[in-house]
Amino acid sequence: MSRKIEDLDPRCQDAARKTLNALNADDELKNSGVAGWLIVETRRELAVQMAYFSRGRMAPEHVRMMYDAAGIKQQLSDKETQTAITTTLKSKHLAGLAMDIVPIKADGKAWWDAPTRVWMRMATIAEGFGWESGVRWKDFPDYPHLQWRGA
């Protein structure tokens, strides 16, 4: 699991940098309380994808075993183990063609529950640089997710 732009497929690295620069420079986002953006994940190993996919599909103890096997150091509550966070084993993250980003508040903390307008603005800006945004997915919205459209 990586957070580095350099671990993305070379075809989308420049777009990732430009997207983050544009997000950080956007006055509408600044006025909404966004101080910056954190890359949560870029390229992902299959074991990590399988662990994510197990959530909501396996018993809590088995989900935790999947997380341990993937090397994910995260303590999950029983409720979290039963909450699906992906619908696929074929994520664009596996090929380095996706990244998850989250806004940061002025206190430096990730703003996972930012208002919808923040996520929609992020989507609009990112789409201008060639990304498809999970914000717009009807069946399973994934607000932090951006995947390269050229792939």
Feature names for model-found ranges:
Residues A35-S54:
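Acidic helix-start/capping segments at beta-turn-to-alpha-helix junctions
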